């Protein structure tokens, strides 16, 4: 299929060569190299970072929470979206690099957020519609599948043209609007879900199309911020020694200190 070029970056290649050591470090003298094809077998987790979760168990947790949504309209939209996107939800990252930028990252992010939303819906039950919060949490990042382009390994390579022109908030709201219309969901509920998606970045300077103006959308934006920042801490702390301070973390606009060993 032609020589390997820079355009093949982040794709899998098959190499034939000789392994030796140079100054104590293993190296390969390459005799032949080609792009891997469908006949080649390899363990994806040995080549790229993957979420530290059991995918099937985590997917079952998400499906259980969807089933627990008591409002039939919100539950129907979520079930329909799950049926259409389940396979991609199992594998795609949630970002290119900032947080959850690994295989199954979006599933991990969504599941953690839904469990947090479920807890907080009970804590603030006097003002929160649990069904709306859980549905909005499940749906908030679905359009990332369209926002990014992906390598052969499943990692994010770039933003798609639509991703650059519209972004996942607008595309997500559009899809929810279309699905709600197909299912005959009342417009007021469709608009509320669209608002949840469009406002979940909290402030326009952080990418929100509109500010969250209902309790559920405010809570969703805070849950999203919490989980994304904790994942940034997790990834940063994993590379530090106890007592060490990191270099400046761009996404946090500060350094990170590791006071103790991680749990597990």
Regions found by a protein language model. Give the residues of each.
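A short mid-domain helix/strand-loop element embedded in enzyme catalytic domains
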Residues: 74-118, 139-147
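N-terminal intrinsically disordered, cationic/polar leader segments
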Residues: 221, 243-255, 260-264
């Amino acid at each position: 299929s032609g020589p390997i070029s820079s355009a093949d970056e982040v794709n899998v290649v098959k190499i034939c060569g000789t392994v030796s050591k140079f100054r104590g470090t293993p190296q390969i003298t390459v005799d032949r190299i080609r792009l891997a094809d469908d006949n080649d077998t390899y363990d994806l987790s040995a080549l790229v970072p993957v979420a530290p979760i059991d995918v099937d168990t985590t997917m079952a947790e998400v499906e259980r929470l969807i089933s627990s949504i008591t409002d039939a309209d919100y539950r129907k939209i979520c079930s329909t979206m799950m049926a259409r996107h389940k396979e991609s939800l199992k594998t795609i990252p949630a970002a290119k690099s900032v947080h959850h930028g690994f295989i199954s990252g979006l599933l991990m992010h969504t599941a953690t957020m839904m469990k947090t939303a479920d807890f907080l819906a009970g804590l603030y039950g006097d003002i929160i519609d649990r069904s709306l919060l859980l549905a909005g949490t499940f749906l908030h990042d679905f359009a990332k599948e369209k926002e990014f382009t992906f390598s052969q390994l499943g990692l994010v390579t770039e933003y798609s043209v639509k991703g650059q022109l519209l972004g996942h908030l607008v595309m997500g709201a559009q899809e929810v609007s279309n699905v709600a219309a197909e299912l005959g969901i009342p417009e007021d509920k469709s608009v509320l879900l669209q608002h949840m998606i469009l406002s979940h970045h909290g402030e326009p300077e952080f990418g929100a199309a509109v500010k969250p103006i209902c309790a559920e959308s405010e809570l969703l934006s805070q849950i999203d911020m919490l989980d994304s920042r904790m994942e940034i801490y997790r990834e940063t702390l994993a590379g530090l020694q106890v007592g060490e301070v990191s270099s400046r973390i761009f996404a946090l606009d500060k350094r990170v200190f590791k006071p103790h060993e991680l749990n597990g």
